[in-house]
């Protein structure tokens, strides 16, 4: 699949979607985007900047949600123009799709909304590439139906994203088999290495996270074979206004990406027999 000027798929090196969870300020957005751009340029990794203008599904009504659509899109447009990188953000309402699609290069749908047929099709109908996050409550094979709904609009630029599955209360687990299963959609598969270590509602009025396991799951996902990685990062995760406990420190991003590149290179120089189970008899 052609995505933001590069090729995305198992035949190609992984791409990266990364940035702070929420847009906290213009200066933070620009600085983080510049740092990530430079890191990815040194490593030769295709990069799309990610940040959200509104976190509509925070645990508490008192939690920081972001600057709102108008200010958030202004900042994302400035990042796109001044830093020179494509941008992705999530959209939560059908009514917002057209305005957001005018600014960003990739649209993302939240995991909680993946079963909302009208919403998924409204986002896909905008004609931009779409990253559909799999709900924590959904089996990986059920994403075939979600992807089919999106493609029914005529948009073939659809990606599917694994971000963990509910494992009892306040916990998620990542089943690496899901990455192979979701390839059956015919879409590039993305692994969200940071939300997968989230502990939803684990701090009472907010979500917790186990940041130390981000490299573990990222290495496993790349070894399983993915087209892209999604990682939320922050210069100071402890000070992040949203999802700090499961954000990877920006200062450690380059070292982690180097390791993941080595794994990706080895894995993609071999066949993926799991793609042809009928031959394994």
Curated annotation (Swiss-Prot):
It comes from the Bacteria. Pathway: Carbohydrate biosynthesis; 3-deoxy-D-manno-octulosonate biosynthesis; 3-deoxy-D-manno-octulosonate from D-ribulose 5-phosphate: step 2/3; Bacterial outer membrane biogenesis; lipopolysaccharide biosynthesis. Its main location: cytoplasm. It holds the Pfam family DAHP_synth_1. SUPFAM superfamilies: Aldolase (SSF51569). It is found in: Cytoplasm. The gene is kdsA. NCBIfam families: KDO8P_synth, PRK05198.1. GO terms for molecular function: 3-deoxy-8-phosphooctulonate synthase activity. Belongs to the KdsA family. GO terms for biological process: keto-3-deoxy-D-manno-octulosonic acid biosynthetic process. It is an enzyme of class 2 (transferase). One of its GO terms (cellular component) is cytoplasm. This is 2-dehydro-3-deoxyphosphooctonate aldolase. The keyword Cytoplasm applies. Keywords: Cytoplasm, Lipopolysaccharide biosynthesis, Transferase. It catalyses: D-arabinose 5-phosphate + phosphoenolpyruvate + H2O = 3-deoxy-alpha-D-manno-2-octulosonate-8-phosphate + phosphate. The keyword Cell membrane does not apply. Its EC number is 2.5.1.55. InterPro entries: Aldolase_TIM, DAHP1/KDSA, KDO8P_synthase.
């Amino acid at each position: 699949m052609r995505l933001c000027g590069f090729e995305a798929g198992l035949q190609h090196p992984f791409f990266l979607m990364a940035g702070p969870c929420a847009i906290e300020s213009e200066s933070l957005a620009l600085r983080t985007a510049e740092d990530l751009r430079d890191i990815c340029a040194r490593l030769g990794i295709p990069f799309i900047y990610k940040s959200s203008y509104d976190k509509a599904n925070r645990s508490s009504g008192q939690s920081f949600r972001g600057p709102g659509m108008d200010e958030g899109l202004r900042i994302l447009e400035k990042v796109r123009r001044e830093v020179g990188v494509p941008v992705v953000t999530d959209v939560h309402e059908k009514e917002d799709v057209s305005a957001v699609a005018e600014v960003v290069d990739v649209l993302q749908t939240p995991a909680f909304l993946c079963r909302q047929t009208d919403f998924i099709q409204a986002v896909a109908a905008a004609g931009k590439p779409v990253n559909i996050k799999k709900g924590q409550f959904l089996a990986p094979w059920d994403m075939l139906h979600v992807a089919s709904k999106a493609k029914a609009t005529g948009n073939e630029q659809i990606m599917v994203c694994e971000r963990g599955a509910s494992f009892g209360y306040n916990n998620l687990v990542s089943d690496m088999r899901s990455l192979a299963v979701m390839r059956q959609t015919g879409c590039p598969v993305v692994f969200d290495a940071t939300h997968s270590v989230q502990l939803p509602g684990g701090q009472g009025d907010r979500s917790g996270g186990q940041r130390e396991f981000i490299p573990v799951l990222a290495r496993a996902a790349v070894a399983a074979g993915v087209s892209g990685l999604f990682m939320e990062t922050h210069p100071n995760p402890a000070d992040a206004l949203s999802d700090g406990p499961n954000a990877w420190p920006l200062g450690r991003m380059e070292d982690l990406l180097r390791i993941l590149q080595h794994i990706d290179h080895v894995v993609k120089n071999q066949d993926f027999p799991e793609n042809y189970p009928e031959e394994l008899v």
